[in-house]
Amino acid sequence: MSTSLKHTRIELNNAVFSLPDIVAKAEGYFIDEGVDVELVLPEKRKAMLAAADAPIKQHSAIQSFLWHEGIEKGEFSVYHACEWGQMRRTQDTCAGVKVITKRAAVSTQAIIVRGDSPYNVPQDLADVEVAVNYHAGSHYITLGMLAGFMKQDQVKTVHIGVPNQRFKAVMDGRIQAAAVMEPWISAAEKLGFKVICEAFYNGLEVADPSVDTELFDALRRAHIRAVDKINQDIRPWLHHLTAEVPADIVKLETSDLHLPRLRYNHPEFYSPAEFQRTYDFMVERGLINPESTFDKLVGGRAAELGKVGAQLAS
């Protein structure tokens, strides 16, 4: 390890997404790689958690960065989020941010309704508003999950901020359905809510130009060790997830979490083929500019490694 530590800041997201960062820091894996990592809870996210958003029905009325806007202001240099949203935000960046790799967390989101809801299958949600966070995983996964069951114009979404706000809106009867990730899916099941449909999806890591090749490789090695630690036994780390659910909603125990929902892989390079599938989906729905190609959104070194990986797999 180098005697001189390189410092960088990584955004702290929902625990289910950021668990490899949390583990790598707690176990000293970043330090082992010569990197002093500061995990940053963005100021914008603090504000969003504290105050509920008014429902908004047009995705164009919401700026794509959400609480991730801190990377544009120098608040942090690396963050990860859903694949679709990262493509959109990388298109919109003014800070030279690029995709560098796939996220270690392979997350799931579910559309939930209350236990007394008349809805039971995806088809029942035709023309029913589903609460999502526009330009985030809940938004895109809802479009994808419902697309096979109804016409595109029958999929109705409405923006209601962060997951605790969407959950509470369903709980209070202000909205009929919402898309949420863990630990909120388990909280819903504990309260007798119904899961209408559920799907896994990839995320991407992006970084500003301060993340050079050496730092990129060091972070990736630390994340690989963290994933191995998590997959060896995730149970000591589950309290990070359950802590996100306030006790006045439900007292969620670590034993309430369904462990097969929690998937973590070694970070993989993002291939042109994967990009193209998501690009086509987004262009068809007017969610990204047709000019936002792989070469424009994916960082140079990551792009080359992604192409090599695709060639080796073919």
Predicted regions: what they are:
Residues S2-L143, G148-M150, Q176:
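Short, glycine-/small- and polar/acidic-enriched structural segments
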Residues V23-K25, Q109-Y119, F200-F216, R263:
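A bilobed periplasmic-binding-protein/Venus flytrap-type ligand-binding module shared by bacterial periplasmic
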Residues T157-V158, V162-E244:
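Pocket-lining segment of extracytoplasmic ligand-binding domains
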Residues Q152-K156:
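Juxtamembrane helix-loop boundary signature in multi-pass membrane transporters
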Residues T213-N289:
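Secondary-structure end/capping motifs
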Residues R45-M48, L66-H68, Q165-A169, W184, ...:
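Short, hydrophobic alpha-helical packing/hinge segments within bilobed ligand-binding/sensory domains
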Residues V283-S314:
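Conserved C-terminal helix/tail region of periplasmic/extracytoplasmic solute-binding proteins
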